[in-house]
Amino acid sequence: MEELPRALNYELSHDLHFDHYAGAAAQKILNSGRSSPEASTPTITTLDAISSSDFLKQIGQQILSSIQLKHQHQLNEVSHPRNSTSEEIMDFDLANRVILDSSSVDQLQQQLEYDKFMNEVWIGIVFTLILISMVFCICSCFLYHQFRTWKRNYRNNANGSTQCTIVDIEALKLHPDVEDPVPEYTLVSGLPSYEAALELLQKSPQSSCLIVYPSVFNVFNKQERSSQELQHPGVATSAPPAAPENHLAPQTPSFCDATMPLLPATTAAAATHAAATVTAVTAATATSATLAASPTCESIKPNFVMMPIVPSYAEVFGSSYKTVDEKKKSKSKDSQSKDDIKR
C-alpha cells in the first residue's frame, strides 16, 4: 500500500481530473507527491476520506485499461512490426489524449515539395512549347516572304522578256532595213557565216588561198615533159642548150610550175596544142614558145581559190530568213514597184 501512491504519481497520466473524482483530498495527494517522497505518503485519515468516494474505482479501472492496452500493443508489435502509428492512435482512447506524430508532417512536407517540383516542370514544358511555336512561325513567315519575292521577280522577268521580244518584232516590222543583229560567227559551230566568209575573202589577198604541194609536182612535171618528148621528138633534139639549164636548175619547182598540174583539162589541152605548133627554127624561139605555152600565176590564181563550205542563214533558219543584201534588194524592188504604180 505504501508503494501504490508513488507508483500512481509516476505512472498515471496527468490528464486525469482529480478534482472531479476525489475533490480536495485527491488534489492534496497529488500535490504532496510532487513535493517529496516522505511528505507524499498518505495518512490513514486521507485514505478514509478517499475510500468514501469513487476515486479508487476510477483509478483501478484506469490501471486495468492501461495494462490491457500495453499488452495489446506488445502483441501488435510482435505480429505486425511494420504497422504505422495510425493503428496505435485508433487503439487509444482519444477523448483524453493528444498524440503528435512527426511522420505525417514529413509526408505533408514531401507532398508539398513534389507538387512544387511538378508545377515548375509543367511551366518549363509549356514555355518551351511556346518558344518552339514562335520560332516555327517566324521561320515560316520568312520563307513565305522569300517565296513571294522570288515569284514576283520571276513574273517580272517573264513579262519583261515577252515585252522585249514583242518590241523587237515591232521594230523589225517598222524598220526592215536595219542590219541583222546575228553575229558573224555562229553559236553552234563557231565558223563564220557565208556572208562573213565572202567579206573576209574580199579583204584578204587571193594569193594566200593557193594550195601548193612541192613534193608531188616534180613527178607531174617529169611525166608531162616525157609525154611531150614522145609526141614531139624534133623539139627535144633541136633544143640542146635548154637541157643543161634544166639540169643545172634546182629540183624545187617554181610557184607557177608547182601549180601547173592542178590546172583544169582545158588549160592543159591549150598548152599542149601551143607546144605542138611551135617550129624548131632556133632555140630562142623554142624557149619563148614554151614560156608562152606555160600558164602564168595570174591565170592560175582564180582556179585555186578555196571557198568555205558553210550553210547560209536561210538554210539553217528557213526560207523566211533574209540577209542584209536581200533586205536591201527587196526594199529597192518595193520602192520601184511603188514608183511604177504612182506613174
From Swiss-Prot:
Q: Which Pfam family, giving just one, matches this sequence?
A: Comm
Tell me which InterPro entries the record gives.
Commissureless
For the keyword Transmembrane, the answer is: yes
PY-motif: where is this motif? Answer: 191-194
According to the record, the residues making up region (Disordered) are: 228-253, 323-343
**Keyword Transmembrane applies:** yes
Q: What does the UniProt entry say about where the protein is found? A: Cell membrane
Question: Transmembrane segments in this chain: where?
Answer: 123-143
Q: Which UniProt keywords apply?
A: Cell membrane, Membrane, Transmembrane, Transmembrane helix
List the GO terms this entry assigns under cellular component, sorted alphabetically: plasma membrane
| Membrane topology (UniProt) | Single-pass membrane protein
State the superkingdom: Eukaryota
A biological process from GO: axon guidance
Summarizing the function annotation, the protein's role is: Essential for nerve cord development. Functions downstream of fra to control axon guidance across the central nervous system (CNS) midline.
Q: Which family does it belong to?
A: Belongs to the commissureless family.
Q: What is this protein called?
A: Protein commissureless 2
Give me the gene this protein comes from: comm2
